Amino acid sequence: MMKDLDKLAVAIIGSGNIGTDLMIKVLRHAKHLDVAAMVGIDPASDGLARAARLGVPTTAGGIDGLVAMPGFADVRIAFDATSAGAHARHAEVLGRHGVQVIDLTPAAIGPFVVPVVNLFEHLDAPNLNMVTCGGQATIPIVHAVSRVAPVHYAEIVASISSRSAGPGTRANIDEFTETTSKAIETVGGAARGKAIIVLNPAEPPLMMRDTVYCLTDEDADTAAIEHSIRTMVDAVASYVPGYRLKQAVQFDRYTAAQPLAFDAGERRAGLKVSVFLEVEGAAHYLPSYAGNLDIMTSAALAAAEQIAASRVAA
């Protein structure tokens, strides 16, 4: 049941690490959202138990259990924090009931959304896909370069702690690379994109690290590129406080006589831009090294807050 006329009722599907962290973020920080349901499939999950302790209505009956809940009619937005495979049915069921979906899986049924880049283009989309953790961290940087210089090729490497990669993340590795690569192009603005994910087994666990390489024109303006990148980092940090540059932006020029070799041996002259990022989690529910999960929940919350704010204002 909706508790506040200035808030939209939301449901969170998936009571694992991502869903539980998202629930805590909404409860603590959301101005326009009210958690109406936490949905899982394991009655013994910590996420459902924690939700119940916090007074959030719960069901272990999955999507069908959600639809059967007394407060479901009030739900306007549903976050799906399950898996790409499960999302198709969830999207179909929720769509029938007119519930807008924010998809935190790599299913990519709806348009790719990175809040600082293109959220306002998709506020009314029935299904918004939040790409991947690597996408949320790196696509803003690709876009920052592409808005001041053409990006002929962009490659990102997302390195995350093995301990932060649960069964859902591990099951979706292929979807991660495919979805992120596409979004580097369609959202980031690169002519071609490539994504790589590395699960780092180091102990103690390391924070999420992301490397972004962009190949642009040889005579591109380095000062304009660096300014655009730093402005973008500040914009992302406004909703992911642990997001930061790890070191200065690096530039390397390659001439026709000494071209850059990349992506299966292709060679090209140009300016290579290298950006090194670190993402520290807020440690609401997950440990601080799990920045890869924190950036997903933070981006999803930012998207939902803006959607809700636009509806409340209307």
Swiss-Prot record:
NAD(+) binds at residues 15-18, 164-172, 292. GO terms for biological process: catabolic process. The keyword NAD applies. It catalyses: acetaldehyde + NAD(+) + CoA = acetyl-CoA + NADH + H(+). Keywords: Aromatic hydrocarbons catabolism, NAD, Oxidoreductase. The active site is at residue 133. Pfam families: AcetDehyd-dimer, Semialdhyde_dh. One of its GO terms (molecular function) is NAD binding. Its EC number is 1.2.1.10. It comes from the Bacteria. Belongs to the acetaldehyde dehydrogenase family. NCBIfam families: ac_ald_DH_ac, PRK08300.1. This is Acetaldehyde dehydrogenase 4.
